[in-house]
Amino acid sequence: MVTLSMSTRDYGLMLHMKKTVGRLNADVEISYPKFVDILVAVRNMVRECPYDICEMPFTTYICAREYGKKFTALPVFITRNFHHGAIFASKAAGVEKPKDLEGKTVGVVRGYTVTTGVWARGVLAEEYGVDLSKLRWTPTDDEHVAEFKQLPNVDYKFIGRDIGDLFRSGEICGAVGTVMGEIKSLGPLIPDAVEAGFAFYRKTGIYPINHGIVVRDELLERYPTLAVELFKALKESKDFYLANLDRAGALSAEDTLTVRLEEGLGGDPFPYGVEANRGGLEALTRYAFDQNITSRKYAVEELFPPETLDLVG
């Protein structure tokens, strides 16, 4: 019997598994070490692999594949978001619409390769015609994948700086990510961003993937049924969460969002499996290539264990 460590946040989708699944099969038990900060957990997983199974932002995972990291994702996506509301700009700097960002310096909360930034840049390029090569990007942190090579239009001189301070000082005119605090003349660049996200879904069928779950390759090779059994346990946990959500009661912020998504998307907002997510995966792998995070566009099938490609969740 082997005990595998699994590190994720306590999302509603995950709680049933964490409370009920100790023994996965005759050979494998799952332990859930006390969760550290998500940024710390992901950075450690990419650089040192201290966990056997770990939550990971999906473009961090794609970038990690580019540099030969020894773990593989399951087709399970435990966080998602629309990113129209993650694009901010300063009207004082003359930014009234997305195209106005061209020629400007735009901050990125955390690293250039973070999934929110990748989706936000995709929105700017594909929905609003912004030429991303004309923007200069300034992350506030380094990359999870330390080997990632600096791009000509990405400048890391603001690492450790606060995005709000950079706006106030006039050193940046826009930003992608979560911008905290009240900043005069600063606001979301896309009007009614929530509705814009749902409109994006109606047009594309995509509810953007943020975080998935990866498993160390050595374990997938040693235990041939592990990927499928983990998928089934994760699906059961998600199904339990959705089936037992007290939609008529007092809801947490997470649960309230889930109910709104069920209504807005017309069903399960968190489908697992490759085919149910092919549109989003194709878009994200294309964006990763277009934004020079990877040297080629990865085929969706390359990203998951072969035995999981036909699973439905």
Language-model features and meaning:
Residues 1-5, 95-105, 290, 295-297:
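Immediate post-signal peptide segment of exported/extracytoplasmic ligand-binding proteins
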Residues 3-15:
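Extracytoplasmic "Venus flytrap"
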Residues 12-133, 138-144:
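Short, glycine-/small- and polar/acidic-enriched structural segments
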Residues 35-54, 117-118, 143-183:
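Short helices/loops that flank or line small-molecule/ion binding pockets
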Residues 152-246:
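Pocket-lining segment of extracytoplasmic ligand-binding domains
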